[in-house]
């Protein structure tokens, strides 16, 4: 799939002085997809779930590849100002480097093929935008999103549903490795999904819960993290389902390019993480790479390495990890080694890193009151 497949998703107004293009939304063309019974909806949900499970297994989440390409094109451009280059850059979407945007667009394509079996599905599916780390939920949901104060850093697939007169929304979120259909009913009754455990790692268990709010225009997504010492933290995100999102490439994919974390994640059909590579970008010093993988016995192994060590690749321990990770990520060893070496060159370019983090700061400032 290429960006050109999605005409109209890359263009958005970009006011001078604003760090991102303004997000744009469309209008729904019809009513929610109607089901005479819960059983008929369950038939659809089973088909949707199979599709999302196949997708998360077949495609890695990869925000490293698109970032490396962005850096190389910036260097080749001869530009000195990253912000100027960023404003004119059109982020391509390729299946080797899918983030939440590419995964959601790919899933939309696949699900629309089910329209013969479930008439109205193709026209009912839409992209929903999501704002993360919300401090004041009540204030946020009292209005439609303000284009100038949101960053819309995440997208997912949604479908409005009507089950015997009961309204709700079905969500599919391959970008966050959710390999199931999340059903959110207004009355919170079956088939409402409720809370479920998304991941259970030795250091932390993540539980997700979803509920409709804001007169049905928003889904409140709560991420509850329980540490092994008993400490619990709950994060709130808001998914806007009031209108279909029309700028996933121009806004969300572009925003992802300057985020201060890079990751490459392999998943199984249940959304379990088979391998992860994560790099948080500090303002100074050598970034740390955190890697983990599932062993054949189901045990989770985890290590940390300085990013610069991926340039020479002389450490036998790193070579061993690259080989194991490449297998879990369904990549060739040389491909993964080159990708990590390229990432190291990009992030050890201190002028580039400083400009990158400055853009990220500007975006965070715009959305700081959400």
Stretch-by-stretch model annotation:
Residues 237-370:
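Extended, charged low-complexity segments
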Residues 115, 159-163, 295-297:
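Short acidic, glycine-rich loop/turn motifs
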Residues 61-64, 98-108, 154-157, 171-176:
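Long, contiguous hydrophobic alpha-helical segments, chiefly transmembrane helices and signal peptides
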Residues 24, 29-32, 41, 45-56, ...:
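Hydrophobic, Leu/Ile/Phe/Ala-enriched alpha-helical segments that form helix-helix packing faces
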Residues 75-148, 152:
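Active-site neighborhood of thiol-dependent amide/isopeptide-bond enzymes
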Residues 4-96:
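Secondary-structure boundary elements
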Residues 127-288:
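His-Asp-centered catalytic microenvironments across diverse enzyme cores
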């Amino acid at each position: 799939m290429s960006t050109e497949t999605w005409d109209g998703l890359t263009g958005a107004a970009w006011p001078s002085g604003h760090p991102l293009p303004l997000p744009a939304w469309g209008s729904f063309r019809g009513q929610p997809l109607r089901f005479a019974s819960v059983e008929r909806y369950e038939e659809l949900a089973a088909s949707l779930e199979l599709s999302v499970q196949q997708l998360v297994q077949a495609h890695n989440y990869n925000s490293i590849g698109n970032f490396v390409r962005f850096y190389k094109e910036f260097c080749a451009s001869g530009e000195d100002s990253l912000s100027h280059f960023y404003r004119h850059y059109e982020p391509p979407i390729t299946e080797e480097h899918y983030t939440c945007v590419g995964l959601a667009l790919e899933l939309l394509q696949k699900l629309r093929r089910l329209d013969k079996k479930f008439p109205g599905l193709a026209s009912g599916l839409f992209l929903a935008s999501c704002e993360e780390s919300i401090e004041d939920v009540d204030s946020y949901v009292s209005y439609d999103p303000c284009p100038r104060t949101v960053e819309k850093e995440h997208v997912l697939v949604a479908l409005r549903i009507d089950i015997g007169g009961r309204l709700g929304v079905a969500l599919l979120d391959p970008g966050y490795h959710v390999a199931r259909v999340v059903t959110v009913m207004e009355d919170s009754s079956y088939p409402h999904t409720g809370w479920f455990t998304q991941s259970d790692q030795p250091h932390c268990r993540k539980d997700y819960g979803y509920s409709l709010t804001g007169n049905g225009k928003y889904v409140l997504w709560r991420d509850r993290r329980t540490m092994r010492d008993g400490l619990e933290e709950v994060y709130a995100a808001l998914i806007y389902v009031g209108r279909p999102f029309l700028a996933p490439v121009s806004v969300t994919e572009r925003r992802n390019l300057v985020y201060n974390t890079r990751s490459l994640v392999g998943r199984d059909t249940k959304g379990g993480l088979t391998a992860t590579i994560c790099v948080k970008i500090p303002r100074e010093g050598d970034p740390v790479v955190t890697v983990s993988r599932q062993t054949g016995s189901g045990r989770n192994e985890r290590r940390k390495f300085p990013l610069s060590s991926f340039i020479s690749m002389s450490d036998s321990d790193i070579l061993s990890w690259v080989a194991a990770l490449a297998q879990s990520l369904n990549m060739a060893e040389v491909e993964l080694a080159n990708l990590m070496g390229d990432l190291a060159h990009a992030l050890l370019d201190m002028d580039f890193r400083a400009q990158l983090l400055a853009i990220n700061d500007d975006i965070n400032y715009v959305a700081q009151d959400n």
